[in-house]
UniProtKB/Swiss-Prot annotation:
InterPro entries: His_Pase_superF_clade-1, His_PPase_superfam, PG/BPGM_mutase_AS, Phosphogly_mut1. Its EC number is 5.4.2.11. It comes from Nitrosomonas europaea (strain ATCC 19718 / CIP 103999 / KCTC 2705 / NBRC 14298). Homodimer. This is 2,3-bisphosphoglycerate-dependent phosphoglycerate mutase 1. It is an enzyme of class 5 (isomerase). PROSITE patterns: PG_MUTASE (PS00175). Gene3D superfamilies: Phosphoglycerate mutase-like (3.40.50.1240). The active site is at residues 15, 93. The gene is gpmA1. Pfam families: His_Phos_1 (PF00300).
Length: 234
């Protein structure tokens, strides 16, 4: 008789609400802290995962504080502070270029409605570019000094965000999953949408319509061919 293999669990978690989420700014790579509501969302996520019997072998996280703080809260609630955590710029949010830090209506007044909104509609459309000497540009931030400057964005389409994370997904995350490791990935809405795209085989048009809520664990159960057999929110 063939032994029935348990599905492999993978959890994707968007960070809790940030101050700029609350105030409706384009955030991107802006390093913004959690709001009080976001801290509560992270606590709730940790309790939900613990109550549902989840545990993890390793965690992945972006370089941005709102994701890092969310992960720290979840790990504390679950008693998993000892776990190794892989932090990488490749899991950072999509870069919103010259829109970063702006509210939508201010951006529309400055850049026009189509230049502002096309990147919210089209998979291959990027926001207006930052100038290379802009202090918001990752090339001017010491934390990214070790990254090849040619790989650091001045703005990103969703297609470019997918291309940024794909090497990490294919060369690091998927091999861990193939070994049966239970992973928690804490990141950002647009970045997580590109992971969902690869997991579920969605099109660019489909992920542009997808929404991932702050602080709600998105759980996958994968067979040993890494095909999702179950997908649900806690």
């Amino acid at each position: 008789m063939n032994e029935i293999q348990e599905p492999i669990r993978l959890v994707l978690l968007r960070h809790g609400q940030s101050i700029w989420n609350q105030d409706r700014h384009f955030t991107g790579w802006g390093d913004i802290v959690l709001s009080p509501q976001g801290e509560q969302e992270a606590l709730r996520a940790g309790h939900l995962l613990k109550q549902a019997g989840f545990t993890f072998d390793a965690c992945f996280c972006s370089e941005l504080q709102r994701a890092s703080d969310t992960l720290a809260i979840v790990q504390s609630v679950m008693g998993l502070n000892h776990l190794s955590t892989y932090r990488t710029w490749r899991l950072n949010e999509r870069h919103y270029g010259a829109l970063e830090g702006m509210r939508p209506w201010a951006a529309i007044r400055k850049f026009g409605i189509w230049s502002t909104m096309k990147s919210q509609i089209r998979f291959d459309a990027a926001p207006p570019l930052l100038m290379p000497d802009d202090p918001r540009a990752p090339v001017n931030q010491p934390r990214y000094a070790a990254v090849d400057r040619t790989q650091l964005p001045l703005a990103e389409s969703m297609q470019q965000t997918l291309e940024r994370v794909r090497p990490l997904w294919q060369e690091t995350i998927l091999p861990e999953i193939r070994q049966g490791k239970r992973l928690l990935i804490v990141s950002h809405q647009n970045l997580l949408k590109t992971l969902v795209m690869q997991l579920e085989g969605l099109t660019g048009a489909q992920i542009m319509r997808l929404s991932i809520t702050t602080g709600h664990p998105l759980c996958y159960e994968l067979d040993h061919s890494l095909v999702p057999v179950k997908r649900y929110y806690l």
